[in-house]
Regions:
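Transmembrane helix-bundle signature of multi-pass membrane transporters/permeases
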Residues: 1-3, 124-132
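Juxtamembrane transmembrane-helix boundary motif
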Residues: 7-92, 97, 109-119, 129, ...
């Protein structure tokens, strides 16, 4: 839940610098949201060790991708419906399982389809805000459904941690 206000601040900052493409937010973000919803309910059914293993493998693969990623010389802006659906569902699903905003995946994807680095980063931040909101709702609802009974929590959201860390994360 802490990611919601920090993502909101990030989007606002990128928006002020004209680095958010709202077209990609609408046309791609909807598929990311579906992936987040599926992922948050799936994550609630997994054991902690499974999530740790999944997180480790995905981080390793993402690191390899960043190491070997090559810049495109010709930029052709084309983000087909198939690409938006495929990447959106995967990014949303993986982001919710890992508890991340998805920029580590969305920036390379948006660069791959031809967005400038500034638009890729700003648009990835705006998509991260969608991931934050729907991930938070998904973990809230799935935690209530499976009756987590975690003290001082609603679903998987710990209220004291949320209240303590919000001021710290927004200031930074």
């Amino acid at each position: 839940a802490i990611i919601v206000p920090t993502a909101m601040m990030s989007v606002y900052t990128h928006y002020k610098h004209n680095a958010v493409d709202f077209g990609v937010l609408k046309s791609y973000g909807i598929f990311v949201v579906f992936g987040v919803i599926l992922g948050s309910f799936f994550a609630a059914s997994l054991h902690t060790k499974s999530l740790i293993l999944f997180f480790s493998i995905v981080m390793y693969l993402l690191a390899l991708n960043l190491i070997f990623l090559k810049e495109k010389t010709k930029i052709k802006l084309k983000f087909s419906l198939f690409q938006r659906t495929f990447f959106g569902l995967i990014v949303g699903f993986v982001s919710s399982l890992m508890g991340i905003g998805g920029a580590i995946m969305n920036v390379p994807i948006l660069k791959f389809v031809g967005y400038t680095i500034n638009k890729s980063i700003g648009s990835a931040a705006s998509i991260g805000f969608l991931i934050a909101i729907f991930g938070c709702l998904g973990f809230l609802i799935s935690g209530i459904i499976i009756k987590t009974n975690i003290p001082l929590s609603y679903g998987f959201i710990n209220i004291p941690a949320f209240l303590i860390f919000i001021p710290i994360t927004i200031i930074m």
